Curated annotation (Swiss-Prot):
Domain comment in the entry: The RxLR-dEER motif acts to carry the protein into the host cell cytoplasm through binding to cell surface phosphatidylinositol-3-phosphate.
Segments carrying motif RxLR-dEER: 44-60
Function: Secreted effector that partially suppresses elicitor-induced cell death in host and enhances virulence of P.parasitica.
Top-level taxon in the UniProt lineage: Eukaryota
Gene giving rise to this polypeptide: RxLR3
UniProt entry keywords in alphabetical sequence: Secreted, Signal, Virulence
Membership in a protein family: Belongs to the RxLR effector family.
Record's subcellular location: Secreted; Host cell
Name of the protein this chain belongs to: Secreted RxLR effector protein 5
Native source species: Phytophthora nicotianae (Potato buckeye rot agent)
Signal peptide positions (record): 1-24
Regulation: induction: Expression is induced in presence of citrus root extracts or during the interaction with the susceptible host.
Keyword GTP-binding belongs to the record: no
Membrane-spanning intervals of the chain: none
């Protein structure tokens, strides 16, 4: 019961010291503005109004087209021109000119494996297998330079697949012979 008396006394004290009664008397519902009308205010706006915003438009777009130059910025970010220069196949040819690997593997054999038909590729891969060239060793040699890696990636992946194919074929032949 004391709580209610305390609450009533607090509310009465607040009403006495506030101007709630005078504020209620000043407001009037008779003063209505038009729907399209605007009222002036002396408060500052955070948004700056310009002549282009005279319509009731929520969008703040410029009237002209927006030109984005993101493709150029992305090219600059990744330095695409520099990468193209590094990965140029001509750079791979310059790197491999006059070099032999393992004492017998040269650029002409790599080019034949890259550009030849299936029979030529099989012949080259058989020759490499007879020389006991391991796919990991070939991959290690051909991935030393980025341009060589890009140009001859097909060769070392195909040679690895060829070696696995020959091993599977040999294993299946052994299984057939054992079953007879």
């Amino acid at each position: 019961m004391r709580f209610y008396y305390t609450l009533l006394a607090t509310a009465a004290a607040l009403l006495v010291h506030s101007d709630a009664l005078s504020a209620a008397a000043e407001t009037s519902l008779n003063q209505l503005t038009a729907v399209d009308g605007t009222t002036t205010t002396s408060q500052r706006f955070l948004r700056r109004h310009t002549d282009s915003e005279t319509t009731d438009n929520e969008e703040r777009l410029n009237s002209g087209p927006i030109v984005l130059d993101t493709a150029k910025k992305i090219d600059d970010l990744f330095e695409v021109e520099k990468l193209d220069k590094i990965l140029d196949p001509k750079m791979a040819d310059k790197f491999l000119d006059g070099k032999t690997f393992f004492g017998w593997l040269d650029k002409s054999a790599l080019d034949e494996a890259l550009n030849g038909n299936i029979a030529q590729k099989t012949k080259v891969f058989e020759h490499w297998r007879e020389k006991r060239l391991r796919p990991k060793a070939l991959t290690k040699v051909l991935t030393t330079d980025p341009a060589v890696r890009k140009k001859y990636k097909f060769v070392y992946e195909m040679y690895d697949s060829y070696i696995k194919y020959v091993a599977r074929k040999k294993l299946s032949g052994l299984k057939r012979n054992r079953g007879d």
